[in-house]
Amino acid sequence: MAGVTAIEIPQWIQDNQGDFVPPVCNKCMFSDQLKVFYVGGPNQRKDFHLEEGEEFFFQRKGDMVLKVIEKGQVRDLVIKQGEMFMLPARVEHSPQRFANSIGLVVERERKNTEFDCVRFLVGSSNVTLFERWFFLTDVVKDLPPLIKEFYNSNEFKTGKPGKGTFACNAPYEARWTDLPVPINRKEFIYDHISEVKNGPVKIYGAPEYKTEVMLLGEGSYDLEAGAVELIIWLQENTFAVVEESGFTYALKSETMVRIKPNTKCLLNVKGGFAITIRMPG
Protein backbone atom coordinates (compact mmCIF):
# COMPACT_ATOMS: atom_id res chain seq x y z
CA MET A 1 0.00 0.00 0.00
CA ALA A 2 1.85 3.04 -1.31
CA GLY A 3 -0.06 5.51 0.84
CA VAL A 4 0.01 3.49 4.07
CA THR A 5 2.94 2.41 6.26
CA ALA A 6 2.43 0.34 9.42
CA ILE A 7 5.00 -0.38 12.14
CA GLU A 8 4.46 -2.61 15.17
CA ILE A 9 5.62 -0.48 18.10
CA PRO A 10 6.86 -3.13 20.60
CA GLN A 11 9.01 -4.91 18.00
CA TRP A 12 10.32 -1.62 16.61
CA ILE A 13 11.36 -0.45 20.08
CA GLN A 14 13.07 -3.77 20.75
CA ASP A 15 14.92 -3.60 17.43
CA ASN A 16 16.14 -0.07 18.17
CA GLN A 17 16.69 -0.26 21.92
CA GLY A 18 20.35 0.68 21.54
CA ASP A 19 19.28 4.14 20.34
CA PHE A 20 17.27 4.95 23.48
CA VAL A 21 20.31 5.31 25.74
CA PRO A 22 23.10 7.94 25.72
CA PRO A 23 24.55 9.42 23.67
CA VAL A 24 21.71 9.13 21.10
CA CYS A 25 18.60 8.70 23.32
CA ASN A 26 16.09 8.86 20.44
CA LYS A 27 15.00 7.16 17.24
CA CYS A 28 12.74 8.50 14.51
CA MET A 29 9.96 6.20 13.29
CA PHE A 30 8.57 8.57 10.62
CA SER A 31 10.34 11.73 9.45
CA ASP A 32 8.36 13.33 6.64
CA GLN A 33 5.56 15.87 7.27
CA LEU A 34 5.09 14.40 10.74
CA LYS A 35 8.11 13.66 12.88
CA VAL A 36 7.17 10.61 14.98
CA PHE A 37 9.91 9.50 17.33
CA TYR A 38 10.57 7.78 20.64
CA VAL A 39 12.95 9.18 23.24
CA GLY A 40 14.81 7.42 26.05
CA GLY A 41 17.29 8.51 28.69
CA PRO A 42 18.89 9.59 30.84
CA ASN A 43 19.09 12.98 29.14
CA GLN A 44 19.10 16.09 31.32
CA ARG A 45 19.01 19.08 28.98
CA LYS A 46 20.21 22.56 29.96
CA ASP A 47 18.64 24.41 27.04
CA PHE A 48 15.07 25.50 26.39
CA HIS A 49 13.51 25.04 22.97
CA LEU A 50 10.98 27.31 21.27
CA GLU A 51 9.11 26.49 18.07
CA GLU A 52 6.05 27.62 16.13
CA GLY A 53 4.38 24.21 16.03
CA GLU A 54 2.70 22.11 18.71
CA GLU A 55 4.16 18.93 20.22
CA PHE A 56 2.33 15.81 21.36
CA PHE A 57 3.88 13.78 24.19
CA PHE A 58 3.02 10.32 25.53
CA GLN A 59 5.01 8.45 28.15
CA ARG A 60 5.10 4.77 27.27
CA LYS A 61 7.47 3.74 30.08
CA GLY A 62 8.48 5.74 33.13
CA ASP A 63 7.90 9.40 33.89
CA MET A 64 9.48 12.50 32.38
CA VAL A 65 9.75 16.13 33.42
CA LEU A 66 9.02 18.83 30.88
CA LYS A 67 10.55 22.04 32.18
CA VAL A 68 8.47 24.92 30.85
CA ILE A 69 8.28 28.67 31.21
CA GLU A 70 4.66 29.37 32.06
CA LYS A 71 3.71 33.03 32.27
CA GLY A 72 7.31 33.99 32.90
CA GLN A 73 7.98 31.37 35.56
CA VAL A 74 10.13 28.26 35.19
CA ARG A 75 8.35 25.16 36.46
CA ASP A 76 8.47 21.38 36.19
CA LEU A 77 5.54 19.76 34.41
CA VAL A 78 5.56 16.03 35.17
CA ILE A 79 4.22 13.67 32.49
CA LYS A 80 3.73 10.32 34.16
CA GLN A 81 3.77 6.88 32.57
CA GLY A 82 0.59 6.46 30.55
CA GLU A 83 -0.13 10.19 30.27
CA MET A 84 -0.57 12.36 27.16
CA PHE A 85 0.23 16.05 26.87
CA MET A 86 -0.12 18.60 24.08
CA LEU A 87 2.37 21.44 24.29
CA PRO A 88 1.05 24.64 22.68
CA ALA A 89 3.13 26.43 20.07
CA ARG A 90 5.66 29.06 21.15
CA VAL A 91 6.09 27.76 24.70
CA GLU A 92 9.66 27.46 26.00
CA HIS A 93 10.33 23.88 27.08
CA SER A 94 13.19 21.60 28.08
CA PRO A 95 12.51 17.82 28.20
CA GLN A 96 14.22 15.96 31.04
CA ARG A 97 14.44 12.21 30.48
CA PHE A 98 15.40 9.49 32.94
CA ALA A 99 17.05 6.08 32.64
CA ASN A 100 14.80 3.20 31.53
CA SER A 101 12.10 5.55 30.29
CA ILE A 102 10.65 5.74 26.77
CA GLY A 103 8.30 8.40 25.48
CA LEU A 104 6.55 9.16 22.20
CA VAL A 105 6.83 12.62 20.65
CA VAL A 106 5.00 13.84 17.54
CA GLU A 107 5.67 17.18 15.89
CA ARG A 108 5.29 18.58 12.38
CA GLU A 109 7.86 19.74 9.86
CA ARG A 110 8.63 23.45 9.80
CA LYS A 111 7.51 25.82 7.08
CA ASN A 112 10.33 27.70 5.36
CA THR A 113 9.14 30.87 7.11
CA GLU A 114 9.28 29.41 10.64
CA PHE A 115 12.11 29.65 13.12
CA ASP A 116 13.14 27.64 16.17
CA CYS A 117 15.11 28.97 19.11
CA VAL A 118 17.56 27.32 21.48
CA ARG A 119 17.83 29.34 24.70
CA PHE A 120 19.96 29.02 27.83
CA LEU A 121 18.95 30.79 31.04
CA VAL A 122 20.87 32.27 33.94
CA GLY A 123 20.70 29.61 36.66
CA SER A 124 17.10 28.82 37.62
CA SER A 125 15.83 32.25 36.56
CA ASN A 126 13.97 33.21 33.39
CA VAL A 127 16.74 35.60 32.30
CA THR A 128 18.25 34.74 28.93
CA LEU A 129 21.97 33.97 29.05
CA PHE A 130 22.38 32.89 25.41
CA GLU A 131 20.02 32.22 22.52
CA ARG A 132 20.17 31.44 18.83
CA TRP A 133 17.36 31.43 16.27
CA PHE A 134 17.62 28.99 13.38
CA PHE A 135 15.69 27.16 10.69
CA LEU A 136 15.36 23.53 11.74
CA THR A 137 15.64 20.84 9.08
CA ASP A 138 17.40 18.08 11.03
CA VAL A 139 17.69 18.28 14.81
CA VAL A 140 20.66 15.87 14.85
CA LYS A 141 22.63 18.12 12.47
CA ASP A 142 21.31 21.58 13.31
CA LEU A 143 21.36 21.65 17.11
CA PRO A 144 24.89 20.43 18.08
CA PRO A 145 26.75 23.39 16.47
CA LEU A 146 24.58 25.83 18.42
CA ILE A 147 25.16 23.95 21.68
CA LYS A 148 28.90 23.97 20.97
CA GLU A 149 28.78 27.71 20.27
CA PHE A 150 27.18 28.30 23.67
CA TYR A 151 29.76 26.26 25.58
CA ASN A 152 32.55 28.18 23.82
CA SER A 153 30.97 31.57 24.57
CA ASN A 154 31.93 34.18 27.14
CA GLU A 155 28.36 34.00 28.41
CA PHE A 156 28.84 30.37 29.41
CA LYS A 157 32.24 31.09 30.96
CA THR A 158 31.00 34.05 33.03
CA GLY A 159 27.42 32.94 33.66
CA LYS A 160 26.30 36.47 32.78
CA PRO A 161 24.55 37.91 29.69
CA GLY A 162 26.90 39.77 27.39
CA LYS A 163 27.46 40.98 23.85
CA GLY A 164 27.00 37.48 22.49
CA THR A 165 23.71 36.77 24.25
CA PHE A 166 21.56 37.84 21.29
CA ALA A 167 22.59 37.40 17.66
CA CYS A 168 19.38 38.83 16.15
CA ASN A 169 15.99 40.23 17.03
CA ALA A 170 13.49 37.54 18.02
CA PRO A 171 11.08 36.69 15.14
CA TYR A 172 8.32 36.22 17.74
CA GLU A 173 7.73 36.25 21.47
CA ALA A 174 7.08 33.24 23.68
CA ARG A 175 3.43 32.60 24.47
CA TRP A 176 2.01 33.84 27.77
CA THR A 177 -0.59 31.22 28.65
CA ASP A 178 -1.82 28.74 31.23
CA LEU A 179 -0.75 25.22 30.30
CA PRO A 180 -3.13 22.26 30.52
CA VAL A 181 -2.51 19.27 32.76
CA PRO A 182 -1.47 15.93 31.21
CA ILE A 183 -4.25 13.44 30.44
CA ASN A 184 -4.16 9.83 31.60
CA ARG A 185 -4.78 7.91 28.38
CA LYS A 186 -6.50 4.85 29.89
CA GLU A 187 -8.69 6.98 32.16
CA PHE A 188 -9.72 9.14 29.20
CA ILE A 189 -10.72 6.06 27.21
CA TYR A 190 -12.66 4.63 30.17
CA ASP A 191 -14.45 7.94 30.80
CA HIS A 192 -15.57 8.15 27.14
CA ILE A 193 -16.52 4.53 26.42
CA SER A 194 -20.19 5.39 25.95
CA GLU A 195 -19.52 8.54 23.93
CA VAL A 196 -17.05 6.89 21.53
CA LYS A 197 -19.72 4.37 20.51
CA ASN A 198 -21.45 7.24 18.71
CA GLY A 199 -18.36 8.46 16.87
CA PRO A 200 -14.86 9.90 17.31
CA VAL A 201 -14.16 11.83 20.51
CA LYS A 202 -11.85 14.84 20.58
CA ILE A 203 -8.83 14.56 22.89
CA TYR A 204 -7.10 17.70 21.62
CA GLY A 205 -8.23 20.11 18.92
CA ALA A 206 -9.86 23.42 18.04
CA PRO A 207 -10.15 26.06 19.29
CA GLU A 208 -7.20 25.53 21.64
CA TYR A 209 -4.98 23.72 19.14
CA LYS A 210 -4.41 23.39 15.41
CA THR A 211 -3.48 19.75 16.02
CA GLU A 212 -6.35 17.27 16.03
CA VAL A 213 -6.09 14.19 18.26
CA MET A 214 -9.15 11.92 18.21
CA LEU A 215 -10.21 8.74 19.98
CA LEU A 216 -11.92 6.10 17.81
CA GLY A 217 -13.80 3.06 19.06
CA GLU A 218 -15.15 0.00 17.27
CA GLY A 219 -16.58 0.71 13.84
CA SER A 220 -15.71 1.71 10.28
CA TYR A 221 -14.19 5.09 9.46
CA ASP A 222 -13.61 6.72 6.09
CA LEU A 223 -10.35 8.59 6.69
CA GLU A 224 -8.67 11.12 4.44
CA ALA A 225 -5.26 12.57 5.20
CA GLY A 226 -5.83 15.74 3.19
CA ALA A 227 -2.85 18.06 2.68
CA VAL A 228 -0.94 16.62 5.65
CA GLU A 229 -0.15 13.19 7.02
CA LEU A 230 -2.45 11.28 9.34
CA ILE A 231 -1.23 8.98 12.12
CA ILE A 232 -3.36 6.07 13.34
CA TRP A 233 -2.14 4.74 16.67
CA LEU A 234 -3.73 1.41 17.61
CA GLN A 235 -4.02 0.88 21.35
CA GLU A 236 -3.44 -2.27 23.37
CA ASN A 237 -5.77 -5.22 22.72
CA THR A 238 -6.97 -3.64 19.48
CA PHE A 239 -7.48 -5.33 16.12
CA ALA A 240 -8.15 -3.34 12.96
CA VAL A 241 -8.11 -3.56 9.18
CA VAL A 242 -7.08 -0.80 6.76
CA GLU A 243 -8.22 -0.78 3.12
CA GLU A 244 -6.49 1.52 0.64
CA SER A 245 -6.29 1.44 -3.18
CA GLY A 246 -7.64 -2.11 -3.33
CA PHE A 247 -5.27 -3.47 -0.69
CA THR A 248 -6.33 -4.82 2.69
CA TYR A 249 -3.95 -4.83 5.63
CA ALA A 250 -4.67 -6.48 9.00
CA LEU A 251 -3.20 -4.52 11.90
CA LYS A 252 -2.10 -5.88 15.25
CA SER A 253 -2.49 -4.02 18.53
CA GLU A 254 0.06 -1.31 19.32
CA THR A 255 0.74 -0.53 15.67
CA MET A 256 1.58 2.96 14.39
CA VAL A 257 0.15 3.66 10.94
CA ARG A 258 1.12 6.60 8.74
CA ILE A 259 -1.28 7.74 6.02
CA LYS A 260 0.43 9.91 3.42
CA PRO A 261 -1.08 13.23 2.27
CA ASN A 262 -4.00 13.09 -0.16
CA THR A 263 -4.62 9.42 0.67
CA LYS A 264 -8.03 7.99 1.44
CA CYS A 265 -8.51 4.77 3.37
CA LEU A 266 -11.13 2.77 5.24
CA LEU A 267 -10.28 1.90 8.83
CA ASN A 268 -12.30 -0.88 10.44
CA VAL A 269 -11.67 -1.12 14.19
CA LYS A 270 -12.97 -4.56 15.09
CA GLY A 271 -12.06 -4.43 18.77
CA GLY A 272 -10.47 -1.88 21.06
CA PHE A 273 -9.52 1.71 20.32
CA ALA A 274 -7.38 3.85 18.04
CA ILE A 275 -6.05 7.38 18.36
CA THR A 276 -5.53 9.55 15.29
CA ILE A 277 -3.18 12.52 15.07
CA ARG A 278 -3.19 15.23 12.40
CA MET A 279 -0.98 18.34 12.55
CA PRO A 280 -1.66 21.00 9.91
CA GLY A 281 0.77 23.88 9.60
Swiss-Prot record:
It is an enzyme of class 1 (oxidoreductase). Substrate binds at E55, R97, E107. O2 binds at R45. Fe cation binds at H49, E55, H93. Transmembrane segments: none annotated. Signal peptide: none annotated. One of its GO terms (cellular component) is cytoplasm. Residues 163-179 are annotated as: Linker. Gene3D superfamilies: Jelly Rolls (2.60.120.10). Residues 180-281 are annotated as: Domain B. CDD domains: cupin_HAO (cd06123). One of its GO terms (biological process) is quinolinate biosynthetic process. GO terms for molecular function: 3-hydroxyanthranilate 3,4-dioxygenase activity; ferrous iron binding. It is found in: Cytoplasm. Keywords: Cytoplasm, Dioxygenase, Iron, Metal-binding, Oxidoreductase, Pyridine nucleotide biosynthesis. The keyword Metal-binding applies. Residues 1-162 are annotated as: Domain A (catalytic). SUPFAM superfamilies: RmlC-like cupins (SSF51182). Its cofactor is Fe(2+). Pathway: Cofactor biosynthesis; NAD(+) biosynthesis; quinolinate from L-kynurenine: step 3/3. Pfam families: 3-HAO. HAMAP family: 3_HAO. Catalyzes the oxidative ring opening of 3-hydroxyanthranilate to 2-amino-3-carboxymuconate semialdehyde, which spontaneously cyclizes to quinolinate. This is 3-hydroxyanthranilate 3,4-dioxygenase.
